[in-house]
C-alpha cells in the first residue's frame, strides 16, 4: 500500500544520517527501520513544546467481555499493529534535522499487570524520544480484564482512533481490512503544497488582527490547575440541512466571545482532523491529520444572523484548503499573524459521543481522552450527536473561575438554539447570551433599589445648623464660619437675591476663586429657590460665554476679585464678600419658602463631543439621596474635616462641600495658591482627616507627612495597585466611581489589597448597577462579559439642560429586562442612565471598570469627550485632514497618562500613497497662534500635551479608527524617544533649542506653512521652501517678537542655528525706524516716485490705461458687508499709500501725494450674481473704476452667489506688489476673524521713498549711461505695433516629485537656491529653442525691499518696491556649468540687484537710457508660494478669475518684456506661465522652449542627485 512513495524518499538525501541517529538513540538494528518520515508541523510543535511527558497522552480502556479469548484478542490487535504503521512509529530528535518519525519493523509491546485499573492508569508512560509511543497492557482486577492502550498525543487524532478500533473488530472477526493508506501519502501531499499560496492566504486572513484574548490571564503565569465542566445533553431545535455543524458552532462561539470581548474582531483556535479531500481515500489514511489554526470572524452586531452565517460559511470554504498550516507556522509570518495566533480559547467539534467504535462482542471502550488537547486556558469541546448537544469545558482555574466556565458553556448552547431558530430579519445584537442561572444572580444583586431622600439639600444642612450652630462649618484661608453664621449669611443673601427678582428655577452662575464665600453663595442660591452653576473664572472667555448663554438668567454671583470680569451685555455681576456683605447685612435671617425636592439644585458642565460643553441639571432629590448614601459609605460625620481640593467645575466639589455640610462636618478651603503648592503641609495645617483625590494628585503626597488623614477616597480616573498600596495603612481607603449625571458617586469600594483588583469600583451606592450589551441596552450582559454600565436609582440627574435630544439618548426608560424581572424577582419601571463606561461583573457582584465605550476619557480627574478635543484640533491646527486624540501611558516607570493628538495632513497622506505597508509617526510642534487658539477654546486639562503626525490613520476591520493601535504607536514612540534621549547625549543636544531658536522655529513654521516638528537646527530656510518674498514675511514675524534680523542675515545665515546666532534685539531708539510717524503719513506734500514707479510712468504715459493686480477669494465662512467695509477702512487708513494720488507736474514729471480721505480712496459694493458671465461683468466694471489721478486706487466686490460667498479685490499696481498683497490679506483676515490688529504698521512707503531717494543721490555717482546696442533679433521676431495688445499664454506644471527636489535636496550638491536652478533651466532651455539668438536680454524681477540700513524695516509696508536686474549667463558646455555660472552671477550682485536698479535712476540721462531698453526680451518673476492662502484654516482660498473680466483698456498697457515668465509654487508643484504677444511669429519655437524648460527641471533634479 506504500509502494507509490519509496521508503525514505521524504527525508531527502541524508538518509544515512537519519538512520545512524535512530540506531544510536533507539539502540536498534538499522535493518529493522522500515521508513523514516518527516513530522507534520502540528506534530513537531507538540513534540518540541510539551511541558510534561504525560500531557495529552491517550489513555483508552477496553473492558473485555467474558467470552473474549485472550489469544484471539492478542492476534487481532497484533494484526492491527502490523497493518497500521503509525502504531510502530517512534520519534527521534536530531540536533540538525529536528524531529522526525521512524517506522519500525516490530511487534506490539505488551505488558501484563494485576494492579487495579485505577493504579494501572496512573502508571507513567514509557514513551519518549527513541522509544515506542504506543504501548499496550492487559490489566486484571479480580474477574474483570481490561485492555489499556496508551499513545502519545502527537501520534493520533479522533478519526484515526475510530478507524483503528474498527480494524480491531475486523481482525477479531477475521474480516479483511479495507484499503488502508500510509501516513506518507498525507505527508507527501504537505511537502508538495505551494508554500507561497499558504503564506499569502494566512497573511491576508489575519491582516490587521487586533482581537483581544479570552480568557485574559490576570497576572504572571502560574502552574496550570485544570478543571472540567461537562454540560448535560440537551435537545436542539431541528437544524436545517443547509446549516453546516461547524459553521453553527463557530458562529455561536464568535457571538459569545464577542460579548465578552466587547469587540467585533474575534479570533479563536480550532483543532481539526479534516482530511484533505483532494487525496483519494483520504479517510483511510492512518496517521494524525490534526491541525490547529486560528479562525477569525467579524461579528457585526447590526447584521442579520443569516448574514453572519453566510460570512462564516464563506470564510470556512475559503480557509479549508489552507487549514494544514499549523498555528506555529502562521504565527511566524508577521506581526498581524503573530497576534492572531495568540488566542486563549480552543474549539473542537465532535459529531460522535466518543472516538471509539464499540463492538459489544469484544467489550466496551471507556473514553479517557480529556487531557489530550494541550495547555490552552480554555478548551471547548462541542458534541453534536443526533439532534442533541453537549459542551465540555477544560479550563485553567488560575485564569477562569468555575462559574464563568459553566456560564460560557451554557451560553454557547443558548446562542446555538437562537441561531437555529432565528428569523431572517433577526440581528446579531438581538441574541441573548445571559443564561437563567446568571440572570438570577444579577437580580439578586440589584433587586433592592434604595429609597429616595425627599428633601431639599439646604433643608438637610439647616438641620445640622439647628443641632450644632456653634460648630465650624467652613474653615477657609479667608475666614471661618460656624453653622449658625453660615445659616445667617446665606439667608440674608437669599433675601437680597429675591429683591433682585431672581425668580425660582433660575440658574445662577457663580464665579469664585477658592473662598469661604462660595459656601454662602451656594446655600443662598438654593434657599431662594434657584440652582447654582460653578464656573471657572480662569477658563476661556469663549467657553464662559457659551455657558452663560446656556443657563440664561441675568445675575452672576462673583467674588469681589472677579466682579469686573467681562460677562457680556446680558449679565451683570453681584459681588459676594466681606465688603459687599454690607449691602444685605440688615436683611432677614429667616429662610425663604423651600422649593420642591424635584427642582434643580445645581447645573454642572462637562465636555461635549460637538465642541460645546453639556450642562447637567441635578435636582435636590438626587443631591440629597446621593449625599446621604455615599456619605454613610465614606463615614462622613460631624467630626470630619474634609479638604475642598477639587476644582469647582469638577463634581467632586459637591461631595467636599454639600455632603460634608449635610453630615455636619467642616469644609476646609485652601487658597488657590495653597492648593497648587505644598499639599501635604496644607492637609496637616488644616487638620484634614477626609479627602477625595485623583490618583495623579495622591502620588505627589507622602503618606507619612499627612498623619491627620484617616479617610481617603481615590477616584476620577483609574488607579493602580501601587497608588493604593501607599495608602493601605489608612482606616478607610475607598475607590470611588460615579458619572456627573449620577451625582458624584454611584459606586464605592472599600479597598482590601489582599483580594482586590485595581480596576474594581465596587457595588452600587444609592442606586442599582446593571451591565448591558454594548450595542443593545435591551439585552443584559453575561456575568464576566464586558458591557455598558447602566445606573438606576434616586441619584440620577434630570438630564442635559435644555437639550431633550441628548437627554433621551442617555437616559432611557423601562428597558424590557427591567419590566420582566426574572427568576422570582418582580419587574419594575425605572429610569436609567447609560454611562458609556464599559465594565464587567466580578463573581461577587462588584464591578470592574474596563474602559470608555466612546471616546470620553478622564485625565487628572476631569472627564472629557475626545471628540471635543479632536474637533478643536481640526479647527485650530492648520493643515489637519484627520484628527484623533487618545490617552497614552508610556512604558517607563512612574509614567503619567498623556493626552495626545494624532493628525494626518495633506503632506502625510501624499507621502503615504507611496507606502501603504507601515504607519510612520513623528512628533509635531504647534505654532504660537495655534496654541493660542486651542487655549482659547479648550480648558487647560483638555489641551493635548503631545502632537503626532501619522502617515495614515490605522483602521479596524469594521472601518473605524483603530484607537488601540494609535495608543500603542504613541506610547511606543514616547518610550523610544525617552530611551534615545537617555542614551544619546548628542541627540539631546540636537533636540534642545534655546528660547530664541524656538521663536525662530515657530516663525519659520508660520511663514512656510509647515509643522515646526519638521524644522531642525540645521535646516535651511530656502530648502524648506523659503524665497526672497517669504524672507520679508519672516522679518515681519520676528519683529513682532522683538527679534532683529535683516534680509541679508537670512540669505547669509540660512540655517536656523546660524540665524539664531546673528540675532540682536530691537533697540528702543530704533523702534521709530521700523514704523512711520503720523506726520509722515499725513503729509500733503508731493514726494518722489520709487524707481519702479518711475519706470512705469515713463513707459505708460496714458493714466487711464488699466494696470492693476487683483485677487478673487473664496470665503471659508460667511462675512457681513459691514465687517468687510470696516476692515477695508482700517487697512486703507493704516497704509497711506492706498490713498495715493498721482499727477503730472508742470515739467511733465509724475509725482505722488497722500490724500486724507479714506472713504474717497476706495470703492466697495455688494453684488449678487447668477453665473460667471454676470460675475465677469461686475469685476470688469470694478477694475475700470481705478483712477490714479483722482482715485480710487482700491476697488472691491462682495459677491453673493448661489452656493458661496466670494470677495474680489483689485488695486492699482503702482502702489502694490506681491509682498504687499501678503501683508494686506493677512491683516484683512485678522480683522475679519478677531476684529483688531495686534501689530503696529510698518514704515510708511512715503518715508521709504524719501529715504531711498536721498540714499541714491548720495551713494551713487552719476555715470554716463552705456549706449547698449540691442542684440540682433532673429528672423521671425519682428513685432507688429500692437506688441502690448492681445497675448498668448503657454504654461506647464512640474510634477511634485521633481518640484520637491528643485525646492529641496537638489540644492545640496552645489549649495544653490531654488531660484538659481530655475534661472539655469530658463537660460539653457531658451538657448536650445532659439540657437540663433545670441545673448538675449533676460531681466529678473525681485521684491526690492533691500534696506541699506538694518534699522529700516519695510517688512510690514505696503507699496511698489519691485526691482529689475539683468542676468548675464551664457549656457555652458554642461548643465552643471550653467548652474554654477548662474549661482556665481546672482551671488555677485550687490543687494540682490537693488543697487543695479537704483543706480539707473540717479540722473535724467541715466533714466532715459535705462528706460529705452524696454521692452526687454524676457522677464522672469518668481512669486513663490502664497503660504497663508494654502493653510487649511485660512479664511480665504484663491479662485480663478472668470473669463472676459478684463477692462477694455488692459491690452493697451505697456509691457516690460516680449516674453514675460511667472513662476509660482502651488500645492507643492512648480508652475510656469509664459505670456507673449500673439503677433509674434514664434509659436513653434515657444512650444519647443516650454518643453525644454520643463525637461530641464527634471534633468537638474536627476543630475544633482548623482553629484
Curated annotation (Swiss-Prot):
Its EC number is 6.3.2.-. Residues 991-1067 form the Carrier domain. It is an enzyme of class 6 (ligase). InterPro entries: AA_adenyl_dom (IPR010071), ACP-like_sf (IPR036736), AMP-bd_C_sf (IPR045851), AMP-binding_CS (IPR020845), AMP-dep_synth/lig_dom (IPR000873), CAT-like_dom_sf (IPR023213), Condensatn (IPR001242), PKS_PP-bd (IPR020806). Residues 1087-1503 are annotated as: Condensation 2. Residues 462-860 are annotated as: Adenylation 1. Keywords: Ligase, Phosphopantetheine, Phosphoprotein, Repeat. SMART domains: PKS_PP. Pathway: Mycotoxin biosynthesis. One of its GO terms (molecular function) is phosphopantetheine binding. The keyword Flavoprotein does not apply. Nonribosomal peptide synthetase; part of the gene clusters that mediate the biosynthesis of the host-selective toxins (HSTs) ACT-toxins responsible for brown spot of tangerine disease by the tangerine pathotype which affects tangerines and mandarins. ACT-toxins consist of three moieties, 9,10-epoxy-8-hydroxy-9-methyl-decatrienoic acid (EDA), valine and a polyketide. ACT-toxin I is toxic to both citrus and pear; toxin II the 5''-deoxy derivative of ACT-toxin I, is highly toxic to pear and slightly toxic to citrus. Gene clusters encoding host-selective toxins (HSTs) are localized on conditionally dispensable chromosomes (CDCs), also called supernumerary chromosomes, where they are present in multiple copies. The CDCs are not essential for saprophytic growth but controls host-selective pathogenicity. Although conventional disruption of ACTT2 could not be accomplished due to the high number of the copies identified in the genome, the high sequence identity among these copies of ACTT2 is likely an advantage for RNA silencing, because it allows knockdown of all copies of this gene simultaneously. NRP synthetases are composed of discrete domains (adenylation (A), thiolation (T) or peptidyl carrier protein (PCP) and condensation (C) domains) which when grouped together are referred to as a single module. Each module is responsible for the recognition (via the A domain) and incorporation of a single amino acid into the growing peptide product. Thus, an NRP synthetase is generally composed of one or more modules and can terminate in a thioesterase domain (TE) that releases the newly synthesized peptide from the enzyme. Belongs to the NRP synthetase family. This is Nonribosomal peptide synthetase ACTTS4. It comes from Alternaria alternata (Alternaria rot fungus).
